[in-house]
Design a protein with these regions (language model features):
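Mixed-charge interfacial surface used for oligomerization/domain docking
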Residues: 3-6, 11-26, 31, 93-113, ...
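N-terminal glycine-rich anion-binding loop in soluble enzyme alpha/beta folds
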Residues: 5-65
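Class I S-adenosyl-L-methionine
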Residues: 38-107
Length: 282
């Protein structure tokens, strides 16, 4: 293991605590603003509590990016310890968080490398975990960057949400489209393209949208759909997680399934009831 490389990510990546502890990864949190109070994402409020509030109250959550000061503090700490820093960021197109890190890097002497996953939530977290595995194997930063670039060309990630309300609030869809969609019980199928959330399809009802999402993924994969690993992202709907697990086992026959909980800052823009799958093209 290359003990001199310190991996840092932001809370947009939704890396679970087991991975953070296993690979000694530091997280720079974004800020969630809920009912007039500020919370550090993943520190001051857990996803389970957050989604409960969303379902039970008429809450209007907002988020703010991680700041220059946050990155300067953590970069200072580890460069003074003689560490080489590898910061793996959530999509720079979706938030100014990565730019905050770039500005902090300019003002600090030391070896700091920044990799933009161009993705969000478990799509970004997956890159963090893969990088950590490679660093543990003794790979160099250059080798890690090359491997991550190759992964970018091969992965397929799609997800769906329970309600269109939060996408409307975030300006992802129009008020008219949200109103019609809610009336007809239309659920969107989404992906992260060029760092931003975009719609790839839709279906009526929860059951239909999951099946449609799987069909869209299979189309992307082509003939060879069996997988060594499948990554499942979910928010607060454990039944949906189990349903996705059953379907993933049946369709993709993976040797391993890993789970990521969609955190509060992503959840503020997606709402509760998120479910998604990440797989790979051969």
């Amino acid at each position: 293991m290359n003990n001199n490389i310190k991996i840092i990510c932001d809370s947009l990546s939704d890396v679970n605590k087991e991975y953070l502890q296993q690979y000694d990864i530091d997280v720079v949190p974004l800020t969630l603003i809920l009912n007039g109070k500020e919370y550090r994402d993943g520190i001051d409020i857990e996803p389970e509590e957050f989604y409960k509030i969303l379902r039970e109250e008429n809450a209007h959550p907002k988020t703010s990016q991680a700041t220059y000061a946050q990155f300067k503090e953590v970069f200072d700490k580890y460069t003074k310890e003689g560490k080489t820093i590898l910061y793996i960021s959530g999509s720079a197109a979706a938030t100014g968080t990565c730019q905050s890190a770039i500005m902090a890097k300019i003002d600090i002497e030391g070896d700091i490398y920044i990799y933009d996953t161009n993705n969000l939530t478990f799509g970004s977290g997956f890159f963090v975990v893969k990088a950590a595995e490679m660093i543990k194997e003794g790979k160099t930063i250059e080798e890690v960057f090359k491997a991550l670039d190759e992964i970018k060309e091969k992965y397929v990630l799609m997800f769906t949400v329970d309600t269109l309300e939060y996408l409307k609030k975030g300006g992802r869809i129009s008020s008219t489209k949200a109103a019609v969609g809610s009336l007809l019980n239309i659920k969107p199928i989404l992906e992260v393209k060029d760092g931003l959330v975009s719609q790839v399809g839709q279906a009526r009802g929860k059951k239909n949208v999951t099946n449609k999402m799987i069909e869209c993924i299979k189309e992307e994969l082509g003939d060879d759909i069996e997988q060594d690993e499948v990554y499942i992202g979910y928010s607060d709907d454990l039944k949906e997680r189990e349903k996705l697990t059953e379907i993933a086992k049946e369709v993709f026959k993976p040797k391993k399934i890993e789970y990521f909980i969609v955190g509060t800052c992503i959840g503020a823009h997606s709402g509760p009831g998120v479910g998604g799958i990440l797989v790979f093209k051969k």
